[in-house]
Amino acid sequence: MNEPLISDISRTGRKGYSLNSSDLIRTPHSQLIPGKFLRQSPAELPEVPESEVVRHFLRLSTLNYHVDKDMYPLGSCTMKYNPKINDETCSLEGFAALHPMQPESTVQGALQLMHELSGMLAEITGMASVTLQPAAGAHGELAGILLIKKYHEAQHSKRTTLLVVDSAHGTNPASAALAGYTIVSVKSNGIGRTDLNDLKEKLNGDVAALMLTNPNTIGLFEKEIVAIADMVHKNGSLLYMDGANMNALLGITRPGDMGFDVVHLNLHKTFSAPHGGGGPGSGPVGVCEKLIPHLPVPVIEKRATSEGARYHLTGDCPDSIGRMMNFHGNFAVLIRAYTYIRMLGAEGLRRVSENAIINANYLLSRLDGAYSLPYPKPVLHEFCLSGDLQKKSHGVRTLDIAKRLLDYGFHAPTIYFPLIVSEALMIEPTETESRETLDRFADAMLQIAKEAEECPETVLAAPETTPVRRLDEAMASRQLNICCR
C-alpha cells in the first residue's frame, strides 16, 4: 500500500471543521501578538475533510510495527509486552490532571508514589538512594557521570579520564565526552568479557571511573565483576554500571552487591513502559552512600506530622549537581513502572528475569549452527549472532538478513552492534514471548539461512512485501530533508 502524504490529498476549499463565529476573538491579531511573530502569508495547512483525515491516519497506523502486533527482538532494547493496566493507572484523573506547578499540598499522592518508587528501585538495585529525575537512559548516564565528577571535585582530585569497556552500551562514550572526559577503551577478552590485564594496564591516577554494562551487550555476565570492582576502588576510581540490561538480573543479583557505585536504569525497558521512536523514557540513577550529597535537586523527603506522613520537595542540598531537567522527570513512565513493580512483587520480578534468560537460551539453541556464534554460551537475556558465514559463503550481509526478516512479518533485530562482533545480529526475545512465538521467529531465521545458501538473490532483493522497499539510508543520514515539499 502506497499511502500519500496528507498534503497530497489536500484540495482547496475542503474543510474538516468550521469554527462558530461566536467562538472567534474579535480583537485583531496585531493587538494580541507582536508583529514580528505574525505570519506574512497563510500557513500551508492541508485542507482535508474529517473522514479523510481519520482514514489516512488509520491506514498509516496499520503500517506501524509494535510489540502489540508481534515479537520485537531488538537486542539491548527490551521490547517486552507492556501490560495495559499500566496505562489505566497513569490515566487516573488524580495523576493525568496534575500540573507540575501545583502547590505541594495538592500533589501528595504523586510525591508519595515517587518516594516509594525510589525506595523500591534502591532495594532492587542494592543502592543507597535513587533519583528519578533523568528522562532516559543516556540522560541517566550523563547524570551518573556528573555525580562521579562532582564526587572527585569534592575530594580535590582532578581526574580527566573515563574507561569504557568495548562491550558496553553504545551511548557510554558519548555521555562521558559530554561531561568533559577523555574516553579510553578497555578491551574484551576471547570469551567476550572484560580483559582484566588490559584494565590493569589502563588504570592510573587520572581515571575517574570505569563504565561497563552487566550483563554486557553480548548477553554475557561479567563473572569477574567483584575482582573488577576491587581493582577500580583500589585505584581511587568509581565503578559505573549501565543498567540497560537489568532485565536479566531482577531478584537474582544486585549492582550494589557487586560493588558498583553508580547505576542507571531504563524504566521504559526493564519496568515496562511503551518506548521507541524517541520516547518517552525514564533513566533513574542509583548511588552508593558517599554520592548521596551530590544527587540532583529537588529531593523528595518524607516527614512525620500531626496529620500523618507528608512529602516535601527540598532543594537544600549544597553539594548537589543541580537539576537534570525541569520539574521531576517523565511522570507517566514513573507511574507505569510503579504499577509494574507492585503488580509483580519480588517473586514476580525474579520470574521476569528467569523467563527472559530461558527464552534467550532456547532461541539461541535453535539458531546456533545456522549462524555463527562469536562467543560461547550460555547467555543471559540476549545473545549476539554473526552473519559472517552467510557473507563469506554467499555474499549475503547481516543487513540483507534483517531486510528479509521483514517479509516474514517480524521486526529485525539490532544489527552491526556491538562493534566487537563482525556482521552482528543482536537478539533479545524478552520474557513475554511464548514458545510458539519463539519457534515462529526461529523458523523464519532458519529459512532465511537456507535461502542465503540456495537462492541468495531472494535475500539480496528483500524486502518484497513491505509498502516501502529498500531505502537509501546513507543518503537519508547525510542529506537530511524533513520538508514534505
From Swiss-Prot:
Give the first-level EC class, as a single word: oxidoreductase
Its cofactor is:
pyridoxal 5'-phosphate
Family label: Belongs to the GcvP family. C-terminal subunit subfamily.
What function is annotated for this protein? The glycine cleavage system catalyzes the degradation of glycine. The P protein binds the alpha-amino group of glycine through its pyridoxal phosphate cofactor; CO(2) is released and the remaining methylamine moiety is then transferred to the lipoamide cofactor of the H protein.
The protein's matches in InterPro entries, at most eight in alphabetical order, are given as: GcvPB (IPR023012), GDC-P_C (IPR049316), GDC-P_N (IPR049315), GDC_P (IPR020581), PyrdxlP-dep_Trfase (IPR015424), PyrdxlP-dep_Trfase_major (IPR015421), PyrdxlP-dep_Trfase_small (IPR015422)
Q: How does it assemble?
A: The glycine cleavage system is composed of four proteins: P, T, L and H. In this organism, the P 'protein' is a heterodimer of two subunits.
Q: Does the keyword Repressor apply?
A: no
| Name the UniProt record assigns to this protein | Probable glycine dehydrogenase (decarboxylating) subunit 2
Q: Which organism is it from?
A: Chlorobium phaeovibrioides (strain DSM 265 / 1930)
| Catalysed reactions, semicolon-separated | N(6)-[(R)-lipoyl]-L-lysyl-[glycine-cleavage complex H protein] + glycine + H(+) = N(6)-[(R)-S(8)-aminomethyldihydrolipoyl]-L-lysyl-[glycine-cleavage complex H protein] + CO2
Gene3D superfamilies documented for this protein: 6.20.440.10, Aspartate Aminotransferase, domain 1, Type I PLP-dependent aspartate aminotransferase-like (Major domain)
